[in-house]
Amino acid sequence: MITVALIDDHLIVRSGFAQLLGLEPDLQVVAEFGSGREALAGLPGRGVQVCICDISMPDISGLELLSQLPKGMATIMLSVHDSPALVEQALNAGARGFLSKRCSPDELIAAVHTVATGGCYLTPDIAIKLASGRQDPLTKRERQVAEKLAQGMAVKEIAAELGLSPKTVHVHRANLMEKLGVSNDVELARRMFDGW
């Protein structure tokens, strides 16, 4: 029997996943948590083998939570976003799988079985995005803006240097941050210096 925990701040997602997993004779959902803090308090000692964890939660992000979960538990990250940068971030943080919230029931079940037996699971569409995302995900202009932001330049300075309007620089900044899965200039600089 493979024991599973669900961590998601949306009750309907947890309930739906629990019902789907409960239909499988070798899977048992033994814990459900509505927040990262609840999971940290309730997971230890439950003997959970596989954890399905949402990335976007209000108290602690799933990526932050990943490093604090009990050792020996295989974690599948779950998100509505599946940009290559976000998937890579999750895998680098120790996730053994990544599912989009648009995944099929069969993909959910396959992911749990795969990570429970030591494998890594990505749906084919995410794997393709990840493989193609290993090429530079940014346009030439987005890369220029990213490099300037990482050097600490202000938007107005970047606009003047590249011959763009500040509004255009803001658009490039928003696009590149979404593509790289970062939310501020500090995270962006860290990604730049780590070689993406």
From Swiss-Prot:
The listed locations are: Cytoplasm
Which interval of the chain is the signal sequence? Answer: none
Which Pfam families would you find in this protein's record?
GerE, Response_reg
The alphabetized UniProt keywords are: Activator, Cytoplasm, DNA-binding, Phosphoprotein, Transcription, Transcription regulation, Two-component regulatory system
DNA-binding region boundaries: 155-174
Q: Which residues form the HTH luxR-type domain?
A: 131-196
- Which is an annotated GO molecular function term of this record? DNA binding
- Which SMART domains would you find in this protein's record? HTH_LUXR (SM00421), REC (SM00448)
Alphabetically, which GO biological process terms does the record hold? Answer: phosphorelay signal transduction system; regulation of DNA-templated transcription
Domain Response regulatory per the UniProt entry, residue ranges: 3-116
Q: Which PANTHER family match?
A: TRANSCRIPTIONAL REGULATORY PROTEIN UHPA, TWO-COMPONENT RESPONSE REGULATOR
**Protein name in the entry:** Transcriptional regulatory protein UhpA
Organism name: Escherichia coli (strain K12)
